[in-house]
């Protein structure tokens, strides 16, 4: 076996540069010198011609190129253009006289609203307040509150709304009223309803089978639409 020893290169830098020149591909062949310290740029590696920055790019479509050209034209025409607006005329001053406001409208709202038989809002100087100051409760028979007495003294057999609601609440419920009304009993089981008519005492006594009372409902009603499991 024969071994050959090559002499070591005297200058390592020259040896590496020679190897790079031997193995350099054809696409990278250009006119730049390897002795420069800065690496080559893309413009050195590729042959590109720079066009005017304002000209449209050849890769754009026709519509984009037209829009770009119109925008450049509009910017060129707008340079040095000033908008001349007419001066704004001052608002004319109208001589307004103070509105005639009655003294009743200037009163506090807590003293102002009172209602008469026509349900109209009046001022503090209404006929009701004049009547209230001169009213003698010992003269005449009145029922209800002071407002009801005011209506009754004017010849109206009426009472105010508050006394009317109070009278309705105190009125006893008639037990015989609504005997023939239909009553619907709702059982605890969903979907089952039993209808029965409330009859008089004579018909209950004459019936052969007595009316049994419904069992007391201890289970709450299920108002959902989902059927309950059996």
Swiss-Prot record:
GO terms for biological process: regulation of DNA-templated transcription; symbiont-mediated perturbation of host cell cycle G1/S transition checkpoint; symbiont-mediated suppression of host innate immune response; symbiont-mediated suppression of host JAK-STAT cascade via inhibition of STAT1 activity; symbiont-mediated suppression of host type I interferon-mediated signaling pathway. One of its GO terms (cellular component) is host cell nucleus. A motif (Nuclear localization signal) lies at residues 226-230. Residues 189-230 are annotated as: Disordered. A zinc finger (unnamed) spans 145-163. The keyword Zinc applies. InterPro entries: Aden_E1A. Keywords: Activator, Early protein, G1/S host cell cycle checkpoint dysregulation by virus, Host nucleus, Host-virus interaction, Inhibition of host innate immune response by virus, Inhibition of host interferon signaling pathway by virus, Inhibition of host STAT1 by virus, Interferon antiviral system evasion, Metal-binding, Modulation of host cell cycle by virus, Transcription, Transcription regulation, Viral immunoevasion, Zinc, Zinc-finger. It is found in: Host nucleus. A motif (PXDLS motif, CTBP-binding) lies at residues 220-224. It comes from the Viruses. A motif (LXCXE motif, interaction with host RB1) lies at residues 106-110. The keyword Metal-binding applies. Residues 40-48 are annotated as: Interaction with RB1 in competition with E2F1. GO terms for molecular function: zinc ion binding. Belongs to the adenoviridae E1A protein family. Interacts with host UBE2I; this interaction interferes with polySUMOylation. Interacts with host RB1; this interaction induces the aberrant dissociation of RB1-E2F1 complex thereby disrupting the activity of RB1 and activating E2F1-regulated genes. Interacts with host ATF7; the interaction enhances ATF7-mediated viral transactivation activity which requires the zinc binding domains of both proteins. Plays a role in viral genome replication by driving entry of quiescent cells into the cell cycle. Stimulation of progression from G1 to S phase allows the virus to efficiently use the cellular DNA replicating machinery to achieve viral genome replication. E1A protein has both transforming and trans-activating activities. Induces the disassembly of the E2F1 transcription factor from RB1 by direct competition for the same binding site on RB1, with subsequent transcriptional activation of E2F1-regulated S-phase genes and of the E2 region of the adenoviral genome. This is Early E1A protein. It comes from Canine adenovirus serotype 1 (strain CLL) (CAdV-1). The lineage of its organism: Viruses, Varidnaviria, Bamfordvirae, Preplasmiviricota, Tectiliviricetes.
């Amino acid at each position: 076996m024969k071994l050959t020893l090559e002499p070591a290169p005297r200058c390592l830098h020259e040896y590496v540069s020679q190897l790079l020149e031997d193995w350099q591909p054809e696409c990278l062949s250009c006119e730049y010198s390897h002795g420069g310290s800065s690496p080559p740029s893309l413009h050195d590696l590729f042959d590109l011609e720079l066009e005017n920055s304002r000209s449209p790019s050849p890769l754009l479509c026709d519509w984009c190129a037209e829009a770009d050209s119109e925008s450049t034209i509009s910017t060129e025409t707008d340079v040095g253009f000033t908008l001349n607006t007419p001066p704004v005329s001052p608002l004319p001053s109208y001589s307004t006289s103070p509105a005639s406001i009655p003294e009743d409208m200037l009163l506090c709202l807590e003293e102002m609203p009172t209602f008469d038989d026509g349900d109209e809002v009046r001022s503090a100087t209404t006929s009701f307040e004049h009547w209230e100051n001169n009213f003698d409760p010992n003269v005449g028979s009145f029922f209800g509150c002071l407002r009801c007495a005011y209506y009754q003294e004017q010849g109206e057999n009426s009472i105010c709304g508050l006394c009317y609601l109070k009278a309705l609440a105190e009125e006893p419920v008639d037990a015989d009223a609504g005997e023939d009304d239909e009553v619907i009993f709702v059982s605890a089981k969903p979907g089952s309803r039993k209808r029965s008519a409330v009859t008089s005492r004579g018909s209950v006594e004459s019936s052969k089978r007595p009316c049994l009372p419904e069992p007391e409902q201890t289970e709450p009603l299920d108002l959902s639409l989902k059927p309950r499991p059996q």
